[in-house]
């Protein structure tokens, strides 16, 4: 998955994730996720989005995975992962946006574990904090985003895991 420039493109909606996300096909008939405020509002399959603007983020999908995204990932987790990626880009510049789906999945499972009182430890948290200090600081921002958006607070161990996602996107 990679990020594309979206300002001057045309997209056909395949399906709506929520008010802030759609799965669409670009001009080359490739599946993408478009995320940004209001991009999915009152959209339905077949709608055309012309020149969505610079505030919309576009992520390329592997061939024929758009339907899986529509069925498998709660859009709130995509939005949260997108917000974390945008924050990481402010700190580091360009990063590999293929972490969107794995990061969204990780956050979803983290919240599921919290809801079910399951604790998972990360024996490498101290090492991650030292070796990847900048990534860890960005991941601490993820804690605030998750708390604000979902009302749950992730542990330091989860911050360590999110740091690894961010580090992978920089490598």
Residues of each region from the PLM?
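A cross-family "folded-core" feature that marks the main globular domain of proteins
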Residues: 2-171
